[in-house]
A protein has these predicted regions:
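Charged, terminal alpha-helix-loop-beta segments
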Residues: 1-161
């Protein structure tokens, strides 16, 4: 549901990261050993000259998510990136950040972004996603975020959970 909503509002989503981001593919297949894995979203930034791996998580960020995105970034760097391109960055969009865990992340090309689901009562019930950036991250990565502080996207519920 989260990926579908982002894809429905792709232009708005990309604009929140700043200028130069282009969408390559959702569920981008990569082969690791004899198995295929799928990157939630693969982007490219023409100004930073690098790929961006986006992983969407509906819960609090866990150490396994960091290992997963780092693996995906390494696969892109080894198999897709050219010698003239910069290293791939990774962005984990999660329901809840874990600042304690991120103190120990050694790869400075991995970022976390938190979203919040808020119930909105109207004719058709829907959710809003709000990306909250800490002031520290905004200052450190303002070139990457383009100075934006939040984005709202509507997710229409289609029954079920």
């Amino acid at each position: 549901m989260l990926l579908e909503t982002i894809l429905d509002n792709l232009e708005e989503f990309l604009s929140e990261f700043g200028d130069g981001y282009s969408f390559i593919k959702s569920e981008y297949p990569i082969k690791i050993g004899d198995r295929y894995n799928y990157i939630d979203m693969l982007l490219y930034n023409i100004y930073d000259n690098c790929y961006a791996v986006i992983e969407l998580k509906i819960n609090e960020i866990k150490k396994e998510h960091i290992g997963q995105i780092e693996t995906y970034m390494n696969v892109i760097d080894k198999n897709l990136k050219t010698i003239n391109q910069n290293q791939t960055i990774g962005i984990i969009v999660c329901k809840k950040k874990n600042d304690y865990l991120f103190k120990y992340v050694t790869n400075k090309k991995i970022y976390e972004r938190e979203y919040e689901l808020v119930w909105k009562a109207k004719r058709n019930p829907c959710f809003f996603i709000v990306f909250n950036y800490s002031t520290k991250l905004l200052k450190l990565f303002s070139y990457f975020l383009g100075g934006f502080s939040k984005i709202c996207l509507t997710i229409n519920l289609k029954g079920g959970n």
